[in-house]
């Protein structure tokens, strides 16, 4: 059997083949780069669930119950559990007061009734675990506060010297009773806190303190900047401007 001789590939055709192969290689590289970049962006961006926490805390603090109802629906749709949503509303009473917190809880109950009527079954999530610690609540609260601050606390601010009761309530109740409840992480609790303080307005010293704590517990600078952009749709322009100004100062000082 006689073998047919192979015809040489024309140079122009060969160049076209090589050119096409090169393009395909670059496409693969570009897609890989885009994928990695997207992962990085995703890692440094607030999730829909985290944005919902901001919106829920902000609207509750301001008593905007109509908007709160919408963002509670949104949060539950974004896989915020019922217990997490409830805990956000419980946590913020320490900063916005019982009336705002209670109205928020009542609104959540309305939302759950509406969703149940529509056949939506929301995940209730985990309950707070039982605290098994023989230390006093004051000692436990002090330990948690030092963990948030990132250093041992020496001395007390003047207002706590003037009002030892306030010092005790902060340590025993806020940082022990509330922060110990593991339905939310410290990181999530600080997100609730800065959302409330920023939305109430004219609380720059406290906002400065809690933005620093937010960085201490793991929030990134870019995420906090995104937090301020989320506030644009939940509170007034003056509050957003003040929050952005304080955040800029905090980030600058931490890099000096």
Where are these predicted regions, by residue range?
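N-terminal secretory signal peptides that target proteins for export/translocation
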Residues: 1-15
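Short conserved catalytic/interaction loops centered on acidic-Pro-aromatic/His motifs
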Residues: 203-212, 225
